Swiss-Prot record:
This is Aminodeoxychorismate synthase. It holds the Pfam family GATase. Keywords: Antibiotic biosynthesis, Glutamine amidotransferase, Multifunctional enzyme, Transferase. Pathway: Antibiotic biosynthesis; candicidin biosynthesis. Disruption phenotype: Disruption of the gene abolishes production of candicidin. It comes from Streptomyces griseus.
């Protein structure tokens, strides 16, 4: 079965791609609704067409594009999903307007006629809806075939042409028997007599879609490197080890599982750019350049940063010893949110800091907290390993010298002068932005907007002193300290963006939904139940899970994308969080960097559909996010990648402190609660500065359930917070 899948710039299209591949036995051809290579005669190469969901309205030609003509002509079987359904109905005389209420990421029990698309499906059918508009009136030639419990038309068919539409999303993980519905569309196509035999449709007629078909970068003769390693029993504190080996070096970094325990807190990595093969790379998205420094000299090349990174990694062939972890040196650092301009986003705002900074680490230390083993790693080229082995010996001696040493006490008096904390958008301004978000949702422009604010202050805070305090008051499995010249990043992130192991197994763990810990076991249990059953939190989480499935699916082997477990309440020292896990397997013809490009920025920091929602965010937030909302982690020489989402993170640069906070705005959101959520998420900063959140009108609990009154309650008793 040859299917043309037209993408209306949605964030669920590749979920349809994988479902259709399973139903048809071959992959559909994907084009966007404004594909310049498209011409109507190309339809003859296909058996049927699926018109994807998408933002906007079918009344706006730019939102529906070439789908309008395909739907109007009805030359071959067409299935419209959500926007595709609305546009197809509009093309044949139906009316499309506002639904009684926006419903995004919410389930409904749909009653149907049991024929056509619904043959053999349960009655009623549980489906997931993502829509603000609906078909409100049908002409005689269109027939309704399904309805929701609130009376909204959920499916239709044309009485004489092979056209079908569904308002709900069969590709959502929350929709019952979505695969079966698409298989029924395949069967309807076969009955219509459109089935063609032979190879994949569209071969030689349309350019391959990107990035799902993006091939690995090719270079000239690869540079051959080798990793040598030394393991030692851990007898030293991680903070002491970093302070002794790397802190005063060039571009020191520490990927710090400051909350060891469990799978997410097993490893910490630290290093710098002091070795003989070390390099640094910085991106400037607006200039379209990458500046690389090596051996004391800098050079600037014109290139998109992720393209440059992929080519650089493709030009290395590294022999790696057997190690019990994926990190074996490579590029370490941060990708800023404005790098979205290379990932279907716009270059709307210029960040005051580099759009990405990575260190090519040729020397590093890895701490395995589970086995209490330390690994020293060094990179050598050709047979020149004497210097590397000398470093291994020197590092071992330094560690031996600090074995058993406790970290220095944090300062007993303020170590900085910090001005008042100011918000980019004060409380009234932020509430107005939330209202605009909900207007956009009601108009069908977006399902969910991850709106953020930026807290800023003048400060002379010392990065190392501040990070030492931060990791005590807000330990996290994905904490990080990056002291990269004029910019320092101090992160206490709990969220994994994307991990890819050396065998191509991918994993993302989006978080949507947070509650503080209770003061008593009874209150704690009640908070867990409330989080697990809250319709708003589940809707937020489901939307991002479906988006992440799409993002990973763009570079994944067909049928390998799995969301399991979902909607799990994970309990940490300070919070309960609603977490889902999405896994997939990287395609043979793709690459780890391509997978990062396809998923960046993380959907939990944008909302959905991602591209349209990022445009809304650009307009409303009125400034750059910088490192906040980007990613921190590594691209290993083994091909492995592990990146966190940059949240709960302090950025110090140019005598200024910045700390981003935000939350997902959906139709069910209460604006006052959304502002309060930003205050709750600022708890690590508030403790660090011993201050209150600007504009907060009511007292609340911070992230560990203690009263958030600007004090340092809950901090270690021997700690006096700087500033």
């Amino acid at each position: 079965m040859r299917t043309l899948l037209v993408d209306n710039y949605d964030s669920f299209t590749y979920n349809l791609f994988h479902y259709l591949s399973r139903a048809n036995g071959r992959e559909p051809e994907v084009i966007r609704n404004d594909d310049p290579a498209w011409r109507p005669g190309l339809l003859d190469a296909f058996d049927n067409v699926v018109l994807s969901p998408g933002p906007g309205t079918p009344h706006r030609p730019a939102d529906f594009g070439l789908c309008a003509r395909i739907a109007e002509e009805g030359r071959l079987p067409v299935l419209g999903v959500c926007l595709g359904h609305q546009g197809m109905a509009l093309a044949h005389g139906a009316r499309v307007g506002r639904a009684p209420e926006p419903r995004h990421g919410r389930t409904s029990a749909v009653r149907h006629d049991g024929t056509g698309l619904f043959e053999g499906l349960p009655q009623p059918l549980e489906v997931v809806r993502y829509h603000s508009l609906a078909v409100t009136e049908l002409p005689p030639e269109l027939e309704a075939t399904a309805w929701s419990e609130d009376g909204v038309l959920m499916a239709l068919r044309h009485r004489t042409l092979p056209l079908w539409g569904v308002q709900f999303h069969p590709e959502s993980i929350g929709t019952q028997d979505g695969h079966r519905l698409l298989a029924n569309f395949r069967d309807l196509t076969e009955r219509h007599g459109r089935t063609r035999h032979g190879g994949r449709a569209g071969h030689g007629t349309l350019p391959p879609p990107a990035p799902a078909r993006e091939t690995k970068a090719t270079t000239g003769t690869p540079r051959r490197l080798r990793v040598i390693a030394k393991s030692l029993p851990t007898r030293w504190d991680a903070e002491v080890a970093f302070d002794s080996l790397f802190r005063t070096g060039d571009h020191p970094f520490w990927l710090d599982s400051s909350r060891p325990g469990g799978e997410l807190g097993q490893l910490s990595m630290m290093g710098d750019a002091s070795g003989p093969l070390a390099r640094t790379a910085k991106a400037d998205v607006h200039a379209g350049t990458v500046t690389v420094r090596a051996d004391g000299a800098s050079s600037t090349v014109e290139s998109a940063f992720l393209t440059w990174l992929e080519n650089d990694l493709a030009g290395l062939r590294t022999e790696v010893p057997e190690l019990p972890f994926a990190f074996a040196l490579g590029w370490v650092g941060c990708l800023g949110y404005e790098l979205k301009a290379e990932c279907d986003g716009d270059a709307a705002h210029r960040s005051p800091d580099p759009d990405a900074v990575l260190v090519f680490a040729d020397r590093a230390l890895v701490l395995d907290h589970r086995t209490r083993t330390t690994y020293l790693l060094a990179l050598v080229e050709d047979d020149a390993e004497a210097e590397a082995r000398a470093w291994l010996a020197a590092a071992s001696a330094t560690l031996d010298a600090v074995a058993g040493r406790e970290p220095e006490p944090c300062p007993e008096a303020p170590v900085c002068t910090t001005g008042p904390v100011e918000l980019r958008h004060d409380r009234d301004g932020y509430l107005k932005l939330i209202d605009v978000c909900q207007q956009e949702i009601a108009a069908g422009e977006t399902y969910e907007v991850c709106l953020t604010n930026m807290a800023e202050a003048d400060t002379d805070l010392t990065p190392w002193a501040a990070y030492r305090a931060l990791r005590r008051v807000s330990p996290a499995p994905f904490a990080a300290f990056l002291d990269f010249g004029p910019m320092a990043v101090l992160s206490s992130s709990p969220e994994r963006f994307l991990r890819i192991d050396r065998h191509g197994r991918m994993e993302s763990k989006p978080i949507k939904g947070t509650r503080p810990r209770g003061a008593t076991p009874q209150e704690d249990a009640a908070l867990v139940r409330a989080l697990a059953t809250c319709e708003k939190d589940r809707a937020e989480n489901l939307m991002i899970v479906d988006l992440v499935r799409h993002d990973l699916g763009r570079c994944a082997e067909v049928g390998s994308v799995v969301a399991d477990p979902v909607f799990q309440v994970e309990t940490y020292a300070t919070v309960h969080q609603l977490v889902s896990t999405v896994t997939a397997r990287l395609r043979e013809d793709s690459s780890p960097v391509a997978a990062v490009r396809a998923a960046f920025p993380g959907g939990s920091m944008t909302g959905a559909p991602k591209i349209r929602t990022m445009q809304i965010i650009d307009r409303l937030e009125g400034g750059p996010r910088g490192v906040y909302s980007g990613a921190i982690g590594y691209f290993s020489l083994t091909g492995a990648v592990d990146l966190s989402i940059v949240i709960r993170t302090v950025v110090l640069s140019g005598g200024r402190l910045r700390y981003g906070v935000g939350g997902a705005v959906i139709a069910l959101s209460d604006p006052a609660d959304e502002f309060e959520e930003t205050a709750v998420k600022a708890a690590p900063l508030l403790r660090l500065l011993d201050t209150a959140f600007p504009g907060r009108e009511r007292p609340g609990k911070d992230l560990d359930g203690e009263p958030d009154d600007g004090t340092d309650a809950g901090a270690p008793k021997d700690l006096v917070l700087p500033g």
